[in-house]
Amino acid sequence: MISLYQILAEKKKKKKNDLNIFAFSVFAIICFKFYSVNAIKLPQQEVDALQQIATTLGSKFWKFDAENCKIEMVGLTETPPPTAKQEIECECSPTNDTDCHVVKFAFKDHNLPGTLPQIVKLPYLREIDLAYNYINGTLPREWASSNLTFISLLVNRLSGEIPKEFGNSSLTYLDLESNAFSGTIPQELGNLVHLKKLLLSSNKLTGTLPASLARLQNMTDFRINDLQLSGTIPSYIQNWKQLERLEMIASGLTGPIPSVISVLSNLVNLRISDIRGPVQPFPSLKNVTGLTKIILKNCNISGQIPTYLSHLKELETLDLSFNKLVGGIPSFAQAENLRFIILAGNMLEGDAPDELLRDGITVDLSYNNLKWQSPESRACRPNMNLNLNLFQSTSTKKSSKFLPCIKDFKCPRYSSCLHVNCGGSDMYVKEKKTKELYEGDGNVEGGAAKYFLKPDANWGFSSTGDFMDDNNFQNTRFTMFVPASNQSDLYKSARIAPVSLTYFHACLENGNYTINLDFAEIRFTNDENYNRLGRRLFDIYIQEKLVAKDFNIMDEAKGAQTPIIKPLTAYVTNHFLTIRLSWAGKGTTRIPTRGVYGPIISAISIVSDSKPCERPKTGMSPGAYIAIGIGAPCLIIFILGFLWICGCLPRCGRQRKDPYEEELPSGTFTLRQIKFATDDFNPTNKIGEGGFGAVFKGVLADGRVVAVKQLSSKSRQGNREFLNEIGAISCLQHPNLVKLHGFCVERAQLLLAYEYMENNSLSSALFSPKHKQIPMDWPTRFKICCGIAKGLAFLHEESPLKFVHRDIKATNILLDKDLTPKISDFGLARLDEEEKTHISTKVAGTIGYMAPEYALWGYLTFKADVYSFGVLVLEIVAGITNSNFMGAGDSVCLLEFANECVESGHLMQVVDERLRPEVDRKEAEAVIKVALVCSSASPTDRPLMSEVVAMLEGLYPVPESTPGVSRNAGDIRFKAFKDLRRGMENNSKTQCSVKSYPSSSSTSSGAGQAVQERKKEESRP
């Protein structure tokens, strides 16, 4: 048998640099089941049947090893994703281990384009899994007479009726979700008395639920979402005593929810939403104590929220949004596992209990009649709960109804237009004869309960709901970006929401407006695979008036990845305009993956019909507008600082009587103020060493806590770094960049005051001795990686002034109280002037993080930061520094060790052993691969940071193959470490780097010793 490695070797002889070798085949060693180590023997009939199945399914190449019951290769038109699965399982007779038969085959996530095969020649077959393919045709009636117990055809193109003959089968599992089956649900399915799971969501099924389904007393999972059924929810569901999961979302059935639901004591996951019918009381769930998810959205439920819900200790998600609930809100004090509580769109009154407003819970109280709310209320305290939505949550008629936590809000002026780049950055767009500025909100992370008001602009958005079942709690998934796209930049980004997304403007001129909503479906594709099978439907409301029902972007635009503009009108009477997009449960939810649904929008244009939109009158380019608007203040600060240093301007505060009270120019402090804040630079306030200077904690006279960086003005380098940092930080504003509060130049002192980070640096949090470390689970580390990537993407691609940081490392990543990463120490930042392809510069940075082309030749591009980011991500994943880690054998640093782990297929060895029991293996391996691609030896092999962000968020494929380690001694990435190691061996030293930082793992001669050292450190009190 010729192995794949032999094939690869032959290929490499022909073409060494062919990186797309996997496009022609996939190698899969498949698990098999038999009871002897001897070669098994399948009947030739079954071997031939498998070959015929391959042809019918549309596989272009198939090689089946009958002696070992495994598939060696399945030829495909493209490399399947990591989730692809191909499996043949055989069983042999206990008395004759050569008498074997095929009992299962699975080809999942392969985009096979054929039809369903005949299986009559596989009489022992029990399981078929063909989920996530592109199979068309009908469901063969002959399958009903087989021995099948398990059928999964999730996400395909199958159509026609469900054969009634399946009522005579032995099925225990039937998943037909996300196809195009039509007709009614056969009443014969009621004969499947052993059936445990029946999943029929997202089809074209009509009619009522057959009464015969009452006999399915072994049912544990029943899902009928996104259908066109009729009739009421049947009371016979009380017979399903074993039921654990019930989903009826936009099924077409009407209410009320039967009261007998209370007898389903095994229910864990209850989802009933978007049902029509009369007003109904809250369904009785008092006896269903094991519930973890309760979704009763838009069910026309009235009355009060039952207090017993707050005693459900296992409850994680409670969504009662868009009903008619009144009264107060229970405390939910005993619901210890509660993570999401969505009560939007009701008529709730009174206060929100303090127990509800606790950290770690996402709370949405928007669109209610609460009376407690005021700027002084607990919910309005700064940073009290970052996941709290209070939009239109009070009954008051004042502006605070729309803009909570703002006292005596008054519009400074009224606008006649607004242009928003939803989920993107600020950009100018040519419209007719002008260029309009579309303000971006891409820097604002979303959330299951998010309220955002843009400072000084009087517009914002409210987002409601969580993407269920995606097993992802990162708020970055509420925006989308497609870096590789032929569309205009306006349609490469978008903002999405699971349930409801409302954009508003609070200060518009009254009158008639023309509204253009820009859409593009950037999550689905037009390719001939299952990615084009997705359906996204949502409703559009203007001023809370329904203007479009079941809006489908792909239908309107005649395909995916195609822009479409929806023109609408509005009349503004109270200076307030709302545009709400709402998901009503229709459309697919599992294409291309779980949790893909809900409204999505690329841009919004609002223009008055009677008053002109104010805009710049000159004909300058967008770059000129941005450079003047942002570059000029930076240049002024830069020049002032330079003149101060040269002594051309008076020093700050020399003749001031009371520098603490007098008002200073924005952004400046006196030396006395800084000394007062830091207790005269008391060593006890010293919190670390930044680039070229010490850092002190300080408290200003107004109570603001700052971090003060003290640089030496005696050094020309200190002066230059000071000016660089002032210019860089003052120009850049982003959630993942440190914020500058001000500076001071006085008495040979160069001082910067920037926002104080409660958790110091990432280096301190990860690599300090055990008692000083901050415990970080995998989701936290993943969040930090994403945040750093977004900050760098902003520096490189989104900021009007582009910067290369040049010194990305753990000590230059600061962490706020929520462990949000902030890139700091801009002292080495270089402006990418005139978008040059590279800059030849004097090398500055840190050994171990510097890209080889920069360290050796001073060749500087954005890709140098990408390299440093890759190394940093490996450190975050491993919990060990690159330079202080010395792997087993010839590995001289963490980067080389990680590359070796990829080659050996043991990627999880890179992961911090403290995380391995809990880590999401696929996610961790993907992150490591991203890090290795970023740290490729050649800059051309490294991605852009925007592509890195998309990879981490699952919106862009992670390369399966990464540039490997060069086995000759000249690999430029590791040469410095090898030379250093030889020098240390000659001098009997123990450190691994010229410049290193405190680490929890002392350097040793092998990977095992490094880990042992960390264990020793952690065992100390």
Swiss-Prot record:
Transmembrane regions listed in the UniProt entry: 626-646
Disulfide partners: none
Localization per record: Membrane
Extracellular-facing ranges: 41-625
LRR repeats: 99-122, 123-146, 148-168, 169-192, 193-216, 218-240, 241-266, 288-312, 313-336, 338-359, 361-381
Domain Protein kinase: 681-956
Positions bearing Phosphothreonine: T670, T841, T846
Signal peptide: 1-39
Biased composition (Basic and acidic residues): 1012-1021
Protein name (record): Probable LRR receptor-like serine/threonine-protein kinase RFK1
